[in-house]
Amino acid sequence: MEHSRGDSVEAGEEEEGRGGWDSRSAGTFSSSCTDCSSYCSSDLEPEWLDRVQKNGELFYLELSEGEEEILLPLSPLEPVGVNHVRFSDNEAEILPEDRKNVRKNSEPRFRKLAKMLKKKNNKKGSAELNRQACPTSILKQNSRQKPGIIVHYQYRDTCLYVNPDHLPEDEHKKTSNLLQALIGIVHQSSRNSKRSERQGRQESNQRLSNQEKLVVHGFIPGSPAIRCGQVLIGDTLVAVNDVEVHVENIERVLSCIPGPMQLKLTFETPVLYSGMGLKNQNNQAQTSINDLASLVWGDEHTNSQQDLQHMPHIVMYLTLRLDSETSKEEQEILYQYPVSDASHKLKSIRGLFLTLGDMLQNVTGAPIVSSSLILNGELVHVSYWKENDKLFLISVPAQRFPLLQLKNVTADLVRTLKFMYSTLDRAFCQAENISRLDHFFSLFFQRVLRVFLLSGITGYGPQFYDACSSLLVENLPGVRWLSLPEDIKIQIDTVLSDLEALDFAELSEDYYEMRRLYMIIGTCIFYKGYLLSNHLPKEDLVDVVLYCRQYCLLALASERIGQLIIWREVYPRYHLKHCGSPATEECSEPGGRYFLLIVGLKHFMLCTLLEAGGCTSKATGNPGPDYIYVDQVKATLLQLEMLDLNLEERLGSAPNPCLSCADWFLPSARDKLGNFTSSIVLNKLQTPKRTTSPVSKRRLFAEAASSLRTRRPSPTRSSGGSDSGTDGAGESVGVITHSSPDMARKFGRRESLGSGGSDGSGGSGTLLKINKKKYSLPNPFSSASLRKNLSERETDDIYNTIKLTSGPENTLFHYLYFETLQGVFISPTHKEVEQLGGSIHPQLIKNFHRCCLSIRSVFQQALNKKNSKHSDSKACVDVAGFDPIKEHGVLFECSPENWNDQKKSPPTMSYWVVGRLFMHPQPQELYVCFHDSVTEISVELAFKLSFGIPL
């Protein structure tokens, strides 16, 4: 399974299933030196080594020490993503018994292997142990009950996060204090506690009955037991991770904990009244499907699981070629998820789907894309993807998922499956992939339902913005780009280039005198889900982003993870498409195998695409991750940790370009600010001094921010662009020549030099400046404009603040720019949107993304017609200057929802959502949302200034 962090892989099976490397590619050297991980000279072994599956795949997740207690569910289920201990009746093991080459030297992350406890059971105890395949049940009733009294025992499971790495060195030597130092439970032993030790060898049951129980007598301040709040004085600790414990073996069991993990402690509480039955809860280990979802979404995951049970949804992979000789029932179904009552009715009408997928194409000549039907009074959308004689379809309720979004998501799912398994047939027709696909689609439907639930949340916050933006963002074949100052970007690119060069001692060919195992195709690095730098081809970047998006890795990186390591073989279509094409004169790529390595530390996540074969060693079998490459990627991330503060400062900085809140433009707000021109702040700003130092300017703006607590309203709609340059506006042109984002948000306006009219000089009138040089938004893909460090951001905002709209007011509410050539898009960050607040602005954000989804569907139809072979392109003369530019816009009118004044009608505000598609030199999409007062000339200017990229 893809996310099988909680699954244990036996060492014997692992060695049989894991592949190695072709020794012939290493020349005359010994085959024992072909796998670097097998002859490591170090005495340390990676903590993730036991998690590598038989097919070579690895998914290892370890949360940070502070976040693990919060994010992991407090349930008596087996923890995930951390090191495990394998327990038996009276023993605790770290590695399987057949594990070889045990390492002795260790560092804080690699705990010393504890000595295995010797079994001292007698013949009867050994026979019982052999008959039981699992640890003895701890849910036993006490046989020594007083006559006439019915005593039952309640067993309560509690999860505690423990980290033995934080214990002082002297605590490791004092093994008798582990119960207090590690868990925080104080137990006072009685005087006759060792009486059972003097009784010699007795029957196993008699021996266990004489052993002293671990009664909780107190707690250590600040310990995990105190923080948990579920452990009470008087409780009896009877088991640790389903292993029965007592005074004699508790310290030995705790000493074998290898690293940070969550322990399941089972406490016993006697109940003295009759009539209460003992409930034996059969708690099984939580699957990785729920683990990953609960880690990312927390309590929302539980709600979505319950709603999914009643939501009609299904994924099916059907075959159109049926065997008439065999009358096997449901033979046309190659794969189905889920198998539940909710999907039964959709499954029963699969014949309709097969008919539409096959016969409709024969009639119309075009494959079916989607259909809608009413099922039990509910509208359901169905999306199709046909390849050869196979039909892949997804069905979801229309209320939960728009049809336009379902079409795009279906194409993304197919692309991700091909990236993981090469073909759809290989993915759905191999039995070993069934559980992995169940995991894959379970996460998909949980994401769908979560977005729907969050979109109905009242209020405004990060979750609401996530739900609104995902409607459009998750349909874009790209990732959100975080624009950075040039010096920060150069540092990141330099570090990534050093990694890609593989010019390290253990990665060089001269170190082991052999060919390298892999060649790095490219890398891309993320911070909290934002793309910082990309060295991958665009197609590879999109494949990696879709994979990370499907498995919630971008959302997971927004949390502070301790360590994330993912390794699997992938099939990037860009490279496989260019392999072995001798017919073309272009240089074809060698036929090799490709592997994806993802390493995450804290908020950073680095994705690396590697190639085996060609100029590197040829991979055979199912090779697992090589620890040298993993360590070098970790070292790269540690090298970039110094930029953490700068990146946080960038995410928390003021919006650039500047944004306005829709609530500032309501007429009611304008009435309250009627005496704005007579304010003290404006009098201070109207001083004729222009040579004020930056320090005094910051002091002036600080005074303005503290004295002005309201927003500047928008002007009335003008008939033309030249109306913004009236005398009244001209008097204030020289007033705010240098403005900070904070000041502008308080005023709600952006003054500028120039009128922004239609005579062609409006370009300089839309940008704040102190020199005669024009400023434009930086091109994130060009190193033409150098900027200062992020530490000087507060000073630079005064001089380099940019607004896209012309006129005295900043009327830009939201924007999104999608660069198809690079596979990235730029939009305001979450913090930038949160800073605006407002009551009607959240509804504006929601309408913006919903409208952009519809506009983009029109753009996609235009692109498909252009790329279609059946389009009559020869009939039109292709002139670059006359090439059509697609533009669509929708006018909205909104008002406050909760309007209590019955005598007056609620104030209204109109705004536009406009999308434009540029065809040359490459397709580019730009979506903006602005106030209705903006003229057409101003809109044209805003498009021309789209991030400094020439049209």
From Swiss-Prot:
Q: What is its main location?
A: other
PANTHER family in the cross-refs: PROTEIN INTURNED
Q: Where is the composition biased (Low complexity)?
A: 715-726
Signal peptide stretch: none
Outline the subunit composition.
Interacts with fuz and wdpcp; fuz, intu and wdpcp probably form the core CPLANE (ciliogenesis and planar polarity effectors) complex.
Name the gene.
intu
Report the InterPro entries cross-referenced here. Answer: CCZ1/INTU/HSP4_longin_1, CCZ1/INTU/HSP4_longin_3, CCZ1/INTU_longin_2, INTU, PDZ, PDZ_sf
Tissue/organ expression: Expressed in the neural plate during neural tube closure with subsequent strong expression in the ventral neural tube and in facial mesenchyme.
What is the source species? Answer: Xenopus laevis (African clawed frog)
Q: Where is the composition biased (Gly residues)?
A: 754-765
Q: Which family does it belong to?
A: Belongs to the inturned family.
The subcellular localization recorded is: Cell surface; Cell membrane; Cytoplasm; Cytoplasm, Cytoskeleton, Cilium basal body
Purpose: Plays a role in the definition of cell polarity via the planar cell polarity (PCP) cascade. Required for ciliogenesis by controlling the organization of the apical actin cytoskeleton and the positioning of the basal bodies at the apical cell surface, which in turn is essential for the normal orientation of elongating ciliary microtubules. Proposed to function as core component of a functional module called CPLANE (ciliogenesis and planar polarity effectors) involved in recruitment of peripheral IFT-A proteins to basal bodies.
- Its name, as the record gives it, is Protein inturned
Which biological process annotations from GO are given for this protein?
ciliary basal body organization; cilium assembly; establishment of planar polarity; nervous system development; protein localization; regulation of smoothened signaling pathway; vesicle-mediated transport
Q: Kindly list the organism's lineage.
A: Eukaryota, Metazoa, Chordata, Craniata, Vertebrata
**Gene3D superfamilies hit by this protein:** 2.30.42.10
